Amino acid sequence: MKTLTVHTPSHSYPIFIGNGLLPQAGSLLKPHLGKRAAIIANETVAPLYLGTLQTALDAAGVSHFSIILPDGEAHKNWQTLNLIFDGLMQNRAERKTTLIALGGGVIGDMVGFAAATYQRGAPFVQIPTTLLSQVDSSVGGKTAINHPLGKNMIGAFYQPQAVLADLDTLHTLPARELSAGMAEVIKYGALGDIGFFEWLEQHMPELMTLDREKLAQAVYRCCQMKADIVAQDETEQGIRAWLNLGHTFGHAIETEMGYGTWLHGEAIAAGCVLAARLSEQLGKTSAADTARLAALLEAAGLPSAPPVFAFEKWLEHMSHDKKVSGGIMRFIGLNRLGEANITEITDTDILRRTLQPYL
């Protein structure tokens, strides 16, 4: 097991990374739990891992109850959030009751938002069970639900008490979900570590077959990079925005196609290539870098091109992006592979040229 610590102005917390950690969750997490916990999982993850977690909490003397939600991005909304609140209130959860998010990014985001708002703030713990959530969404305190007009538009910055990433849970992931998570892994190399990007190019076949050692290295490096960035910029006033590489285009894809039609990681993969193409148009990166990024994403079983839809739809969705400031769209681009930048776009013609092959 490896342990990282995330330091933020609000508080510091550990990330536990390793194999076989879920049966140890009670002892590992007990210092970060109250006397009572609410386990929130979805109907897919609960049959796989809920029993193991319940047994671990019983052994640690932590009382608990469970709330089971429908599965999928399409349910990341007010209605499902209210199911969490219903379960908490029906079980008389108090302000010190710890919410435990057992699942992927959708569960983690919703449980975090529920924790941020239930009785004006309850503690929560992340137990991510997908690659995407282990390397990205479980760390850093971004919580949210979707709105029909835009992804993650309603939420809060609210840090967990701890994160426990058991790599064994990745063995039950469908191949498509594993690929989707790999998009975020590749994103880290592209935005800030060319050495890691090159390592991914070398070891992608082993990663896609869940090589234990290589997978642990990749998850640890991603969490390390995110922890370093979050420590410097908890609420995304500056460099934390780099972590949104590909997300402005990607969120537009998810919104246009309907939440869950394209998995988040699939949309981010295509979005990263579009961000590189935009940087090419601005003279900031090379066609060779864009091709190299696309090739690595494709090696992970990911799309490197977006679906086709009207330019006006792209603009409509991107105008709702959370990085928009003073009506000006801000994109995360690349100076080169391994070095991100923040670019303001006032001339939509350059966006049209970037997207032209897909209109």
Swiss-Prot record:
GO biological process per UniProt: amino acid biosynthetic process; aromatic amino acid family biosynthetic process; chorismate biosynthetic process
EC numbers on record: 4.2.3.4
Gene Ontology CC terms, in alphabetical order: cytoplasm
Keyword line: Amino-acid biosynthesis, Aromatic amino acid biosynthesis, Cobalt, Cytoplasm, Lyase, Metal-binding, NAD, Nucleotide-binding, Zinc
Cofactor requirement: NAD(+); Co(2+); Zn(2+)
SUPFAM superfamilies per record: Dehydroquinate synthase-like (SSF56796)
Residues at which NAD(+) binds: 71-76, 105-109, 129-130, 142, 151, 169-172
UniProt GO molecular function: 3-dehydroquinate synthase activity; metal ion binding; nucleotide binding
Cofactor binding: number and manner: Binds 1 divalent metal cation per subunit. Can use either Co(2+) or Zn(2+).
Catalytic reaction list: 7-phospho-2-dehydro-3-deoxy-D-arabino-heptonate = 3-dehydroquinate + phosphate
Pfam families: DHQ_synthase (PF01761), DHQS_C (PF24621)
Binding locations of Zn(2+): 184, 247, 264
Main location: cytoplasm
Annotated transmembrane regions: none
Keyword match Lyase: yes
Name the record gives this protein: 3-dehydroquinate synthase
Free-text function comment from the UniProt entry: Catalyzes the conversion of 3-deoxy-D-arabino-heptulosonate 7-phosphate (DAHP) to dehydroquinate (DHQ).
NCBIfam families, alphabetized: aroB (TIGR01357)
Family: Belongs to the sugar phosphate cyclases superfamily. Dehydroquinate synthase family.
Pathway this chain belongs to: Metabolic intermediate biosynthesis; chorismate biosynthesis; chorismate from D-erythrose 4-phosphate and phosphoenolpyruvate: step 2/7
CDD domains: DHQS (cd08195)
InterPro entries: Dehydroquinate_synthase, DHQ_synth_AroB, DHQ_synth_fam, DHQS/DOIS_N, DHQS_C
Localization of this protein: Cytoplasm
